[in-house]
C-alpha cells in the first residue's frame, strides 16, 4: 500500500522554489513519482501530425515530482502531515500521524 494515492491532496515540500509550498491534487502515481494538477509545469515541443489531427507547437504539461518531495495535506489541521498504517480486523488502512484519524 502506498503512502500517497491518486486523488490525495498534497503539499510540495522540496524542489524548485516556484513549486515549494504549493498544494494540489495527485493526478497519477508512477513508481516513485507523482504528477500533481497544475504544479511543476514544463513546456513540451510537439511535432505536428496531420494523421492524428495534432497541431504542432509548444504545449504546457505537468511533469513528475519525486514522492519524497511531497507530503499529504491534512484539511482538519490545515497543515502537512505524516502518514501511518494500521491493521484493524484484518484490514490495512492509512491514518494521519498527528490526529490519528483514518484517511481511507
Curated annotation (Swiss-Prot):
GO cellular component: ribonucleoprotein complex; ribosome
GO molecular function: rRNA binding; structural constituent of ribosome
Keywords: Ribonucleoprotein, Ribosomal protein, RNA-binding, rRNA-binding
GO BP term, example: translation
Keyword Isomerase set for record: no
Ribonucleoprotein recorded as keyword: yes
Family of this protein: Belongs to the universal ribosomal protein uL24 family.
Entries under PANTHER family matching the protein: MITOCHONDRIAL RIBOSOMAL PROTEIN L24
Function: One of two assembly initiator proteins, it binds directly to the 5'-end of the 23S rRNA, where it nucleates assembly of the 50S subunit. One of the proteins that surrounds the polypeptide exit tunnel on the outside of the subunit.
Subunit structure: Part of the 50S ribosomal subunit.
Name of this chain's protein: Large ribosomal subunit protein uL24
Biological source species: Dichelobacter nodosus (strain VCS1703A)
Gene: rplX
Amino acid at each position: 500500500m502506498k503512502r500517497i494515492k491518486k486523488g490525495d491532496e498534497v503539499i510540495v515540500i522540496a524542489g524548485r522554489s516556484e513549486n515549494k509550498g504549493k498544494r494540489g491534487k495527485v493526478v497519477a502515481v508512477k513508481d516513485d513519482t507523482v504528477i500533481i494538477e497544475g504544479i511543476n509545469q514544463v513546456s513540451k515541443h510537439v511535432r505536428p501530425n496531420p494523421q492524428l489531427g495534432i497541431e504542432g507547437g509548444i504545449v504546457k504539461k505537468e511533469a513528475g515530482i519525486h514522492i519524497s518531495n511531497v507530503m499529504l495535506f491534512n484539511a482538519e489541521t490545515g497543515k502537512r502531515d505524516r502518514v501511518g498504517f494500521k491493521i484493524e480486523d484484518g484490514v490495512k488502512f492509512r491514518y494521519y500521524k498527528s490526529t490519528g484519524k483514518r484517511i481511507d
